[in-house]
């Protein structure tokens, strides 16, 4: 289903008044961490995210969120991608600012601000809608490797070359999907950017070597239901 009614359902006057302040990170965030990743097979067809983004991960801004903040980090990477695609000079919200937005639109109660409560793909869409008025399509995938879901992802990358935020029920770890590869033999891989890294990444290759940026065969996602947020940024 397409989720496109955040402002109508909640009203965004309070959220619109929130100011996203400039950030001073302790070290430069890596850009386009997937840029050094080679395709998983020779030949076949590869579709990837168009446009750059910053790699947000656990603790990258000094906020210690290991164990619960992965959804926020995937959202921050997604927002940095939207801003670049739009040519915007806006700032990426902090975890606390994301929480304040969700409270302002009525999705969460006041106690949510400053908590360690995680967020999922629907909350990620709400924040994207408030900040950038970009529609998203939410897919509920009982089986990620089904022909229907893989067809949706292929069509999405063909049309938008976009950025997908994904989270699961059994596999609760949030991650970004930034590419789709079909081998010459028809095996499907998804390009995953994983925000669970802790520390200071020295390079793109560092993340690739540790497995935080990788191509994953879709059959490895078996056993969990997933929700996917497909950002419909032209």
Swiss-Prot record:
Its EC number is 3.4.22.-. Gene3D superfamilies: 3.90.70.130. Keywords: Hydrolase, Protease, Thiol protease, Ubl conjugation pathway. One of its GO terms (molecular function) is deUFMylase activity. It is an enzyme of class 3 (hydrolase). The keyword Cytoplasm does not apply. The active site is at 70, 194, 196. Pfam families: Peptidase_C78. One of its GO terms (biological process) is proteolysis. InterPro entries: UfSP1/2_DUB_cat. Belongs to the peptidase C78 family. Thiol protease which recognizes and hydrolyzes the peptide bond at the C-terminal Gly of UFM1, a ubiquitin-like modifier protein bound to a number of target proteins. This is Probable Ufm1-specific protease 1. It comes from Drosophila melanogaster.
């Amino acid at each position: 289903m397409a989720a496109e009614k955040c402002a109508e359902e909640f009203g965004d006057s309070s959220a619109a008044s929130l100011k996203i302040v400039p950030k001073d990170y302790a070290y430069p965030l890596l850009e386009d961490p997937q840029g050094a990743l080679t395709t998983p097979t020779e030949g076949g067809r590869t579709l990837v995210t168009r446009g750059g983004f910053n790699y947000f991960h656990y603790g990258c801004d000094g906020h210690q969120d290991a164990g619960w903040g992965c959804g926020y980090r995937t959202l921050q990477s997604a927002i940095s991608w939207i801003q670049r695609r739009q040519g915007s000079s806006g700032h990426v919200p902090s975890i606390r600012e994301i929480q304040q937005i969700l409270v302002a639109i009525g999705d969460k109660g006041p106690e949510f601000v400053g908590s360690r409560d995680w967020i999922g793909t629907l909350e990620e869409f709400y924040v994207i809608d408030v900040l950038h008025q970009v529609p998203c399509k939410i897919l509920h995938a009982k089986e990620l490797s089904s022909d229907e879901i893989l067809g949706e992802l292929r069509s999405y990358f063909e049309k938008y070359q976009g950025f997908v935020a994904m989270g699961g029920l059994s596999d609760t770890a949030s991650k970004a999907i930034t590419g789709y590869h079909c081998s010459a033999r028809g095996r499907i891989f998804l390009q995953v950017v994983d925000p669970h890294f802790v520390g200071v990444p020295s390079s793109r290759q560092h993340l690739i070597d540790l497995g935080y940026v990788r191509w994953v065969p879709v059959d490895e996602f078996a056993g969990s239901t997933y929700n996917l947020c497909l950002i419909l940024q032209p």
